[in-house]
């Protein structure tokens, strides 16, 4: 039986308030994450850090972030989204503020690792929140809309961080954004009420056995989605890391031109991510895997044209199309567990998928760097590597089968795929 709080949470007012605050939480996470990237030159100068040391500081975040995906998803499934969202926000806000107290390279690395661990639980908890506050039919489009915050946050971050860094200095800047995160926690705590996933009550009433996080590892669908998103994330993180250098050294753009042109692919990605869940529901309902296959194949197609483009403007145009279609894969792989699996394991399922994405974020820049060095500065091998990654994502998506069995001999949403 639903309580008054649950009824409020399922109304338009309650569920869209929850969505809005989760969206803002994602934006805050990207602002806090970007603060180190923007302030790193100032920090490096104060501590006399070389590029290798600064790279270690940046990479450490992804290690902590990836480690926390599965535990974060499990905790969200067990304790509900509200507690884990607040706990994650608190930890990463505290360690954001603590960054302003750093006294050495070692301190920066430890704080950055703890920051990644703290923030790592948030994505899965936010996806669990969507499962709690929205019915199953609405979840795919809401996941797509929520994930567009990644690109909005990335666009907002320089506008927030740069003035703070300029007028306050890097230490006070970290204190300020850390305190802002704690203020947001208070708002979330008072406005959002805990809710239960509706299917959980139905499952209990029907006597259906619950699925454990461990049993997710036995579901072929999960591994197919992990591989699909890992492969696309190799493209995503690789281009994010190396495109500015490519445009400078190979296409001979100046920094001003790069600053004006490089936001365009992120705008395209934000649009596609926001649309992805809706497109899956309206145009690919019952054929979800074909959205992933088509989007991954088009990503490979436009990567080739990006590689062979004759002008820098055409490179950016094709990169925008690459980002547009690869973002449909992001929206799709995160939305499919919402449609195909019980809401009680949404946190663990999305955590498992995100391990693939974050692992690629750590690996891809290193692989590409070695390729560029091995081929004397040529990016030819890099682009063929990225094209092969898109093909791998398409192949993995194509292997998804209708009606795969879940533990307990029930089926994975047999009406989809």
For each of these PLM feature ranges, what is it?
Residues 3-11, 196-226:
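Juxtamembrane intracellular "pre-TM" segments in multi-pass secondary transporters
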Residues 36-37, 220-274, 330, 334, ...:
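Extracytoplasmic gate region of multi-pass secondary transporters
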Residues 67-105:
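Conserved MFS/SLC helix-loop-helix module at the cytosolic interface between two early adjacent transmembrane helices
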Residues 70-80, 274-285, 372:
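Helix-to-loop junctions at the C-terminal end of transmembrane segments
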Residues 78-88, 281-296:
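Cytoplasmic membrane-interface "Motif A"-like loop-to-helix N-cap segments
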Residues 111-150:
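Cytoplasmic helix-loop-helix junction between adjacent transmembrane helices
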Residues 146-192:
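Helix-loop-helix hairpin linking two adjacent transmembrane segments in secondary transporters
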Residues 338-376:
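A late C-terminal transmembrane helix in Major Facilitator Superfamily
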């Amino acid at each position: 039986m639903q309580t008054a709080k649950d009824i409020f949470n399922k109304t338009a007012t309650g569920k869209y308030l929850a969505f809005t605050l989760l969206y803002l939480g994602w934006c805050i996470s990207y602002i806090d994450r970007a603060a180190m990237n923007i302030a790193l030159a100032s920090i490096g100068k104060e501590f006399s850090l070389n590029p290798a040391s600064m790279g270690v500081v940046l990479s450490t975040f992804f290690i902590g972030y990836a480690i926390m995906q599965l535990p974060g998803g499990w905790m969200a499934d067990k304790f509900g989204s509200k507690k884990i969202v607040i706990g994650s926000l608190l930890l990463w806000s505290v360690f954001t503020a603590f960054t302003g107290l750093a006294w050495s390279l070692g301190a920066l690395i430890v704080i950055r690792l703890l920051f990644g661990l703290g923030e790592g639980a948030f994505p899965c908890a936010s996806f669990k929140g969507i499962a709690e506050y929205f019915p199953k039919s609405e979840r795919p489009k809401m996941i797509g809309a929520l994930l567009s915050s990644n690109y909005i946050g990335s666009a907002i971050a320089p506008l927030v961080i740069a003035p703070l860094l300029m007028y306050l200095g890097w230490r006070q800047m970290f204190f300020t954004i850390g305190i802002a995160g704690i203020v947001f926690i208070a708002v979330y705590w008072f406005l959002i009420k805990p809710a239960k996933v509706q299917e959980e009550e139905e499952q209990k009433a029907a006597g259906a056995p619950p699925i454990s996080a461990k049993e997710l590892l036995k579901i072929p669908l999960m591994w197919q989605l992990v591989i699909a998103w890992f492969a696309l994330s190799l493209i995503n993180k690789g281009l994010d890391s190396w495109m500015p250098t490519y445009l400078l050294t190979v296409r001979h753009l100046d920094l001003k031109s790069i600053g004006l042109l490089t936001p365009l692919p992120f705008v395209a990605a934000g649009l596609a991510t926001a649309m992805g869940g809706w497109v899956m529901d309206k145009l690919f309902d019952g054929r979800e895997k074909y959205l992933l296959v088509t989007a991954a194949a088009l990503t490979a197609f436009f990567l080739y044209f990006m590689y062979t483009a004759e002008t820098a403007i055409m490179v950016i145009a094709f990169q925008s199309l690459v980002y547009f279609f690869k973002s449909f894969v992001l929206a799709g792989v995160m939305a499919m567990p919402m449609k195909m699996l019980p809401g009680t394991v949404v946190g663990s399922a999305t955590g498992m998928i995100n391990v693939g994405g974050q692992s690629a974020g750590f690996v891809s820049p290193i692989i590409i760097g070695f390729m560029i060095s091995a081929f004397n500065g040529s990016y030819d091998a890099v682009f063929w590597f990225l094209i092969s990654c898109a093909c791998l994502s398409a192949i993995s998506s194509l292997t998804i089968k209708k009606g795969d069995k879940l533990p307990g001999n029930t089926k994975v949403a047999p009406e989809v795929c």
